[in-house]
From Swiss-Prot:
Its EC number is 6.1.1.10. InterPro entries: aa-tRNA-synth_I_CS, Anticodon_Met, Met-tRNA-synth_bsu_C, Met-tRNA_ligase_1, Met-tRNA_synth, Methionyl/Leucyl_tRNA_Synth, MetRS_core, MetRS_Zn. SUPFAM superfamilies: Anticodon-binding domain of a subclass of class I aminoacyl-tRNA synthetases (SSF47323), Methionyl-tRNA synthetase (MetRS), Zn-domain (SSF57770), Nucleic acid-binding proteins (SSF50249), Nucleotidylyl transferase (SSF52374). Its main location: cytoplasm. This is Methionine--tRNA ligase. It catalyses: tRNA(Met) + L-methionine + ATP = L-methionyl-tRNA(Met) + AMP + diphosphate. Is required not only for elongation of protein synthesis but also for the initiation of all mRNA translation through initiator tRNA(fMet) aminoacylation. Binds 1 zinc ion per subunit. Residues 628-728 form the tRNA-binding domain. It is an enzyme of class 6 (ligase).
Length: 728
């Protein structure tokens, strides 16, 4: 097999927050593919970096009273620790705030300028007079010009999905200072993506098929997944627009040459260029020559460049990035693989539900990172579909597959080999056992008596990123191995010394099956595979070991004493994990306030008691201090949806928008409101009420309603209030 030379990247995590389980989908997906390629002895270089520039980093550093570089250095170490904890095997992890990256950015800019693909234009922007800075789109909020939802970002509406210019917002305000922004003009630099040269290049590049590489069981490969190519075609058909690549000072980033330090490269220009900066720094550290660097970064070399990204950044990677590279003298990506998002238990990750889980928290709670690597692999395919982390399925699948099927083979057979046969395996097996072994090694291919080596089928699935199919095939082989052990019953054979030859044979064959499964699973479970190699007394396994003509280990091969390889997941561990990650919008309330809220909650979910004749309302409850009242976190919420609850006489199920997330609340207002009346309405909710498990689901708060025999009457804020606002 000829060696491939591949530069592989994952999208750069932003140096302004923690790595969470959603991020890990991409890094685990990439790492599995890289490890598989390396097991085939291809030359693969997996590089990444922290995306370390931009306004959010500048502002956060200011809030913390440190410099941006102090912030990004701290976050770099946090990210690297998280990635190491999940066995993400970067060959190099760097930062975009580097001299290499700056040199690449400036060179690309100069080449595009020389090719007349940079334009200078005056643009009108919002300016914060308090902070004395132009505001990025995401730091401007206001009322959507289409649906009039409040508290929407300056570039798109999360309520109706509309996109618009920040200057289109109604009643805009600065998310940095709260001030009303001013409109000011400034000269900006644009990459002319609308140029006919860019359009012609992209139309050809996007739909171009790539010749198969040596050792890949595909005649040609598409550059993009079909759904990604279709999306690109939509954007091309709508017409390409020029891309603003500059930002005004103050800004944390690289200054644009010949602008006197007043203009900076937009973070989205220098971020993908960071792939090149990281790669060059890595090769320099390993004393590689400029010619070797150019082989990967310049056109004409027999190398590949493969990007793994989330589907939300496809526009940047499949339009701007290749066009910039093509017209600045650099090589373009060979392939771009986009993946979907992660949901947890069928819903978006949520801090209130404890499902917005950081990598650090997962590891600190003592959960095995390879449990998650395996589960993601069992769910991932080659499409851009979202994947769901169902905790119930997570526990069941890991316990069944990894412990019950894979590790179980070794634990059931190793002891007999070490105790009765000095730890030595036999190569002499009966025809019956050889048939079992062949059934393990080969899988049916279509109809009839056509068979394919299972290692070839699994390899093809790994290559195409169809990991779920690879896992299914591997577990099918594991089923054969366990059926063999169950049929031969070594624990019964061991009771009579006259069965020693057969016992030796059965346990040796089973451990050879375990060895093959270890080869298959090694890209997914690198640490477990290493421990299995040590137990089996083997050098690091490669894919050749799955393809060997001598698939049984030699006669007399010695194994080591078996050590426990993996534990089962206890469901209580998941409960502790979600509990540790639950976060209210405000600190927990006191017991006195909890009792007050409980009383309010009862009143909101039942018909209020009628007032006595002649009374305007019910008597006041016992007093509480202003400090205790302040512990109740009241927030403005927008009702996104309302629906009847089957089997409930008084409840409506409300989906609420509180700006930072969505909440589900069951409210006892069915007698007074039709669901259709409530959609789009603003109300007030208790946001830090502990989630309560009800017969119909989990209620994540409580809406406020008044009543003294009539009603209930849902409380609504005055005009101008926006979702997420705190009621004071």
């Amino acid at each position: 097999m000829n060696k491939r030379k591949i530069l592989v990247t994952s999208a750069l995590p932003y140096a302004n927050g923690s790595i969470h389980l959603g991020h890990l989908v991409e890094y685990i997906q990439t790492d599995i593919w890289v490890r598989f390629q390396k097991m085939q002895e291809h030359e693969v270089h997996y590089v990444c970096a922290d995306d370390a520039h931009g306004t959010p980093i500048m502002l956060r550093a200011e809030q913390e009273g440190i410099t941006p570089r102090q912030l990004i250095d701290r976050v770099w170490h946090e990210h690297k620790t998280d990635f190491d904890g999940f066995h993400i095997g970067f060959d190099h992890y760097y930062t975009t705030d580097s001299p290499e990256n700056q040199a690449f950015c400036e060179d690309i800019y100069r080449q595009l300028r020389a090719g007349e693909l940079i334009a200078k234009r005056s643009v009108e922007q919002f300016y914060d007079p308090v902070k004395q800075m132009f505001l990025p789109d995401r730091y401007i909020k206001g009322e959507c010009p289409r649906c009039h939802a409040g508290d929407q970002y300056g570039d798109s509406c999360e309520a109706c999905g509309a996109t618009y210019l920040p200057t289109d917002l109604i009643s805009p305000y600065s998310a940095v200072s709260g001030a009303r922004p001013e409109r000011r003009t400034s000269n900006h630099y644009f990459f002319k993506l609308s140029d006919v040269r860019c359009e012609a290049f992209l139309k050809n590049w996007i739909f171009e098929s790539i010749p198969a590489q040596p050792g890949v069981a595909l005649e040609t490969r598409p550059r993009l997944q079909p759904e990604a190519a279709n999306k690109m075609n939509e954007w091309l058909s709508a017409g390409l627009v020029d891309w603003d690549i500059s930002r005004d000072a103050p800004y944390f980033g690289f200054p644009i040459p010949r602008t006197g330090g007043k203009k900076f490269f937009y973070v989205w220009l220098d971020a993908p260029v960071g792939y090149f900066g990281s790669f060059k720094n890595y090769f320099k550290q390993n004393q590689r020559t400029q010619a070797e660097i150019d082989e990967f970064l310049r056109p004409g070399g027999n190398t590949e460049m493969v990007h793994f990204i989330g589907k939300d950044i496809l526009y940047f990677h499949a339009l701007f990035w290749p066009a910039m590279l093509e017209f600045s003298g650099y090589r373009t990506p060979t392939q771009i693989y986009a993946h979907g998002f992660l949901t947890v238990n069928g819903q978006k990750m949520s801090k209130s539900r404890g499902t917005f889980i950081t990598a650090e928290s997962y590891l600190k709670q003592g959960l095995n990172p390879e449990w998650l690597r395996y589960y993601y692999a069992a769910k991932l395919n080659d499409s851009m579909e979202d994947i769901d982390l169902s905790f119930e399925d997570f526990v069941a699948r890991v316990n069944s597959d990894l412990v019950g099927k894979y590790v179980n083979i070794a634990s059931r057979c190793a002891g007999f080999i070490t105790k009765k046969f000095g730890g030595e395996l036999t190569h002499n097996v009966s025809e019956a056992s050889r048939k079992w072994f062949n059934q393990f090694l080969f899988c049916e291919l279509g109809e009839g008596d056509t068979f394919l080596g299972r290692h070839m089928s699994i390899a093809n699935f790994y290559e195409r990123r169809e990991y779920s199919k690879a896992i299914k095939e591997i577990m099918s082989a594991a089923d054969v191995a366990n059926q063999y052990v169950d049929r031969m019953k070594p624990w019964v054979l061991a009771k009579d010394s006259r069965n020693d030859r057969e016992l030796h044979e059965v346990c040796s064959v089973a451990l050879n099956m375990f060895r093959m499964l270890t080869v298959y699973l090694k890209p997914v479970l690198p640490k477990l595979a290493m421990e299995a190699e040590q137990f089996l007394g083997l050098d690091p396994l490669t894919w050749k070991d799955a393809n060997s003509q001598h698939r049984l280990l030699p006669d007399g091969h010695r194994i080591n004493d078996y050590q426990h390889l993996m534990t089962r997941i206890d469901p209580k561990q998941i409960e502790m994990l979600t509990h540790a990650n639950k976060e209210s919008l405000a600190p927990a309330k006191s017991q006195q306030v909890a009792q007050a809220v409980e009383t309010m909650e009862k009143n909101s979910s039942t018909t209020p008691a009628p007032a006595k004749e002649g009374e305007a309302g019910q008597a006041s409850a016992s007093t509480i201090s202003i400090e205790d009242f302040g512990k109740i976190d009241l927030r403005v919420a927008k009702i996104l949806d309302a629906e009847h609850v089957p089997g409930a006489d008084k409840l409506l199920k409300l989906t609420l928008d509180v700006a930072s997330e969505q909440r589900t609340v069951f409210a006892g207002i069915k007698s007074a409101y039709d669901p259709g009346q409530l959609k789009g309405r603003l109300t007030v909710m208790v946001a830090n009420l502990a989630p309560r498990k009800m017969k119909f689901g989990i209620s994540e708060g409580m809406v406020l309603a008044a009543g003294d025999g009539e009603g209930p009457y849902l409380l609504s804020p005055d005009e101008g209030a926006r979702p997420g606002m705190k009621v004071k």
